[in-house]
A protein has these predicted regions:
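Aromatic- and charge-enriched surface segment that lines or borders ligand/interaction sites
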Residues: 75-119, 141, 227-230, 281-284
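Short, well-ordered beta-strand elements
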Residues: 25-37, 74, 84-87, 106-110, ...
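Extracellular/periplasmic solute-recognition and catalytic clefts
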Residues: 190-201, 217-279, 283
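N-terminal lobe/hinge region of extracytoplasmic solute-binding protein
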Residues: 31-80, 108-111, 118, 182-183
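Gly/Pro-rich hinge or "lid" segments in bacterial periplasmic/extracellular proteins
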Residues: 67, 158-211, 215, 225
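Surface-exposed binding/hinge segments that line
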Residues: 23, 88, 123-168
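A structural "hinge/loop" feature
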Residues: 34-50, 72-73, 99, 151-160, ...
Length: 290
């Protein structure tokens, strides 16, 4: 713990990737209610989404304005009917263990996800993909059942279409676990102790801009009041989270203390009301329009 650190408190309105700016020290300690999990990029709870995003990356990435930009894929094209997409991958990316990230590795990850398609049935893209193959080391082709408007947007989601080194599959699959969380992202899970802490270190071989911080420790503190006390006593440097993880009254109290720097994000999610058109009464158009 660096005693000179001016502790920072973040209260976010929705879950987001953990970001540290260049002004931060080399090491920082924060807290989370649970361990980050085994960090299988293709599964859900107990894998913590923010931590999956620290280790694993997508072909394309969301921006704050909702646009989608190239990431592990540097460009793409699609057929006139919108069903066949060809991605040109970056040729300078390796997994944190040194394995190359190429079209074969990407295709293997898609296969692993789709072999467990029923688990991802909530995401329509998992139902739309009919074929994924490597055309060359840097060319990946994805074929869909039909033109699917939110294709790129769903590829950009934090899970399940992210990439782990194929050597870390178990029995050529990921649905029943992985050997180790080896991704292409800027962070490496160095150590994890159940109900105690998780330690991430910077991926020194990361292809992109490296984080300014070299090490992040997440202490496991389930109770929000205890987390707040740990922050006040200096046991942790930063609090981060949304309502429930960090009560807004606690945030309001800390924001009045000049010793702390507080920040409240803009909303980063869209809330919608979905109507079940297969069952009464919302199966009636007149009811839905009312």
């Amino acid at each position: 713990m660096l005693s000179t650190l001016r502790r920072t408190l973040f209260a976010l309105l929705a879950c987001a990737s953990f970001i540290v700016h260049a002004a931060a020290p080399d090491e920082i300690t924060t807290a989370w209610p649970v361990n980050v999990g085994p960090l299988n990029p293709h599964l859900y709870t107990p894998n913590q989404m923010f931590a999956q995003s620290m280790v694993y990356e997508p072909l394309v990435k969301y921006q704050a304005d909702g646009s989608v930009i190239p990431w592990l894929a540097k460009s793409w094209t699609h057929s006139e009917d919108g069903k066949t997409w060809t991605f040109t991958l970056r040729d300078d990316v390796k997994f944190s263990n040194g394995e190359p990230f190429d079209a074969e590795a990407a295709a293997e990850n898609f296969r692993a996800v789709l072999d467990n398609r029923q688990r991802h049935a909530w995401l329509e893209l998992a139902n739309q993909i009919v074929d994924v193959k490597a055309l060359s080391k840097t060319e990946l082709q994805i074929t869909l059942k039909s033109a699917y408007y939110p294709f790129l947007q769903e590829l950009a989601l934090p899970r399940p279409f992210r990439f782990i080194a194929p050597s870390q599959f178990k029995n050529h699959e990921t649905m029943n676990g992985i050997k180790a969380p080896i991704g292409t992202g800027p962070w490496i899970l160095q150590e994890s102790k159940l109900n105690q802490y998780d330690v991430f270190v910077r991926n020194e071989n990361y292809w992109g801009e490296k984080p300014a911080i070299k090490k992040i420790t997440f202490n496991v503190i389930p109770d929000p009041t205890t987390r707040a006390v740990a922050f006040e006593t200096g046991d942790i440097d930063l609090l981060y989270g949304n309502e429930g993880l960090l009560p807004l009254d606690t945030f309001a109290r800390f924001s009045q203390n000049p010793a702390y720097h507080t920040q409240l994000s803009q909303p980063i999610e869209t809330v919608m009301l979905a109507l079940n058109t297969a069952k009464a009464p919302t199966n009636e158009l007149a009811v839905r329009e009312a």
